[in-house]
């Protein structure tokens, strides 16, 4: 039986398609170029095969092929297989060639280099020279198809090498088109990235010549050079290149933009106070003046040498502040009796500041304040520049008498402290809470605010270090308070909430506070409290009611009471609790002295299930007063 390729009989167990027969038939694969045993001829033939950039296979096999002469040798080599093979031997050889060629084009950038060792191995085959030649032709076809499929790989490598700036010609001899050495060049410092406009000077980052080359263009050339470099980086590029570019920007950013960061932190303009939506024009003028004074004073303090006492800051007398007054302030601050007070800080209200800005040097005879207040006013005036003083005088002259009276309740407090030290008070309220006005929640006994004495509990905080707190949320106000820890000086503008100033700020909240106070007095005078212990079911939505009151609430320090019971909740169906009930204990935790936010955190932390609550209920609850309190 003849098992040669010319036979038309097929293996009944293996179905071979027509395309595979035509592709791997000896008639298609034979060509006279591969038959001579000279290695030079075979090398030139393979070089010619692999040299096609478009990947088209050579046509020498079909045009000049004379396979009939070598058909006997072909049969002698192929007949060595078993009588019934699952697959022909030439098919297995082609699969082996596929596996051998699978990893070569990926490891080497040039696909022509992968098939050069094939002729050398073909010389030592001996009697199997025809089978190896047929398999080599199959390998050539496979490599030609792979070359056609990967014809864009060198272009991608060129694009990756062109990711560097305009110094591409200088980077090519260093990289030598090798992936390992190119990544190593980036790992050693990426000098072309740092100096994009000088390609011929490729030096290490630590050399003095490189630093001298970078110094003339530090302020202008590196940022424009880095920006187009970042724009040309695709999403799938080398992450090391992106990391180096971002690190150079971060390292140069603080050095180049220190004055601008300070100007943004403490602006001289009134943009923050003007952007906030105020309730009245009078209050807007007050807020703008206070914000302007605090920002100007804070900026002046930061420009001066950092010191702990006000006496060490150089004071320039302007408009009523004489050199004798500044010397008196120095002597008073250096006195042993008042060392702690002078080191802590000082404050004055805006009415005193207005008198000094208008040039009223005789304010000492009219005012009842002591000598230290006048020294504080003069020291604040000395901190302001002439342009800021002129702008402040123009704004003060426009104010009417009713607004000028409110200047007495606004105080500018300057605290001298160590870096990282707190201001000595906490904040309550915010735009996102029930109490919209941000006030002083607590003054710590041994803090700076307590030692200075101006900032009291319940005062409204207008601005801290030139940053207005009007209309800010509670978290934003806390962030501004934390930022005040870093400088050595802190400028706080506060306002005492008197009975006269409350209608101007929040007339609705004032009426609600008076109504709730009247209701509390009427209930307490005519009712007796009864303590109940109830059990409610805690669900994912909570206990089914909302709270009001608490420490630091809108109406002051009030007990935590139930404000409203939600519809559909278990507490509404059981009717065990009512609006107005005071919560004494919640799951064994005492609720006295807690804020509403802290109480809600305790409720959220409780696990789902029954919760025991101790409440206090008035035995006699007038409906009129409770309705007024809820409104």
Curated annotation (Swiss-Prot):
Q: Which InterPro entries does the entry mention? A: IL-16, IL-16-like, PDZ, PDZ_sf
- GO molecular function (one): cytokine activity
Q: What is this protein called in UniProt?
A: Pro-interleukin-16
Question: To which species is this protein native?
Answer: Chlorocebus aethiops
Phosphoserine-modified residues are 221
Q: Where is the composition biased (Polar residues)?
A: 322-344
Skewed-composition ranges (Low complexity)? 132-144
Q: Which domain of life is it from?
A: Eukaryota
According to the UniProt record, where is the region Disordered? 30-269, 317-344
Subunit arrangement? Homotetramer. Pro-interleukin-16 interacts (via PDZ 2 domain) with PPP1R12A, PPP1R12B and PPP1R12C. Pro-interleukin-16 interacts with GRIN2A. Pro-interleukin-16 interacts with GABPB1. Pro-interleukin-16 interacts (via PDZ 3 domain) with HDAC3.
């Amino acid at each position: 039986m003849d098992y040669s390729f010319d036979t038309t009989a097929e293996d009944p167990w293996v179905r071979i398609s027509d395309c595979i027969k035509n592709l791997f038939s000896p008639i298609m694969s034979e060509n006279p170029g591969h038959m001579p045993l000279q290695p030079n001829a075979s090398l030139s033939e393979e070089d010619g095969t692999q040299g096609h950039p478009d990947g088209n296979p050579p046509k020498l096999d079909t045009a000049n092929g004379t396979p009939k002469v070598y058909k006997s040798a072909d049969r002698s080599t192929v007949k060595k297989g078993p009588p019934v093979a699952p697959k022909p031997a030439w098919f297995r050889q082609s699969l082996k060639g596929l596996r051998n060629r699978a990893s070569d084009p990926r490891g080497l950038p040039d696909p022509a280099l992968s098939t050069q060792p094939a002729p050398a191995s073909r010389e030592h085959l001996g009697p199997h020279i025809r089978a190896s030649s047929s398999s080599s032709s199959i390998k050539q076809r496979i490599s030609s198809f792979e070359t056609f499929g990967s014809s864009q790989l060198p272009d991608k490598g060129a694009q990756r090498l062109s990711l560097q700036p305009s110094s591409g010609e200088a980077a090519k001899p260093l990289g030598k088109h090798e992936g390992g050495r190119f990544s190593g060049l980036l790992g050693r410092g990426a000098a072309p990235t740092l100096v994009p406009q000088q390609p011929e000077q490729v030096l290490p980052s630590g050399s003095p010549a490189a630093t001298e080359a970078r110094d003339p263009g530090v302020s202008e050339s590196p940022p424009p050079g880095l920006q187009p470099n970042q724009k040309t980086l695709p999403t799938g590029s080398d992450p090391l290149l992106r990391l180096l570019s971002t690190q150079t920007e971060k390292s140069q950013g603080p050095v180049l933009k220190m004055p601008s960061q300070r100007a943004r932190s403490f602006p001289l303009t009134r943009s923050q106070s003007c952007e906030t939506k105020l309730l009245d024009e009078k209050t807007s003028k007050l807020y703008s003046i206070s914000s302007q004074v605090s920002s100007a004073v804070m900026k002046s303090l930061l420009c001066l040498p950092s010191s702990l006492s006000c006496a060490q800051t150089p004071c320039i007398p302007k408009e009523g502040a004489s050199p004798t007054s500044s010397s008196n302030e120095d002597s008073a601050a250096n006195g042993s009796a008042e060392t702690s007070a002078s080191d802590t800080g000082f404050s004055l209200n805006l009415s005193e500041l207005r008198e000094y800005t208008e040039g009223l040097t005789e304010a000492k005879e009219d005012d009842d304040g002591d000598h230290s207040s006048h020294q504080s006013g003069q020291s604040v005036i000395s901190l302001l520049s002439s342009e800021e003083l002129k702008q402040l005088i123009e704004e003060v002259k426009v104010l009417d008498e009713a607004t000028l009276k409110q200047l007495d309740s606004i105080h500018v407090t300057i605290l001298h402290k160590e870096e990282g030290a707190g201001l000595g008070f906490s904040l309550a309220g915010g735009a996102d809470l029930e109490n919209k006005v941000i006030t002083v929640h607590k003054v710590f006994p041994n803090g700076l605010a307590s030692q200075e004495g101006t900032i009291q509990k319940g005062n409204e905080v207008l601005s801290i270090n030139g940053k207005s707190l009007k209309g800010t949320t509670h978290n934003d106000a806390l962030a501004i308070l934390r930022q005040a820890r870093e400088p050595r000086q802190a400028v706080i503008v506060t306002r005492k909430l008197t009975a006269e100033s409350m209608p101007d700020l929040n007339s609705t909240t004032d009426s609600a506070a008076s109504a709730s106070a009247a209701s509390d007095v009427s209930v307490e005078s005519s009712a007796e409290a009864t303590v109940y212990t109830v059990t409610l079911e805690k669900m994912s939505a909570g206990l089914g009611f909302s709270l009001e009151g608490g420490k630091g609430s809108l109406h002051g320090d009030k007990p935590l009471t139930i404000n409203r019971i939600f519809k559909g909740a278990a507490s509404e169906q059981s009717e065990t609790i009512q609006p107005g009930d005071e919560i004494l204990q919640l799951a064994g935790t005492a609720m006295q002295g807690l804020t509403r936010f802290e109480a809600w955190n305790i409720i959220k932390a409780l696990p789902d299930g029954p919760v025991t609550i101790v409440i206090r209920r008035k035995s006699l609850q007038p409906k009129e007063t409770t309705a007024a309190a809820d409104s």
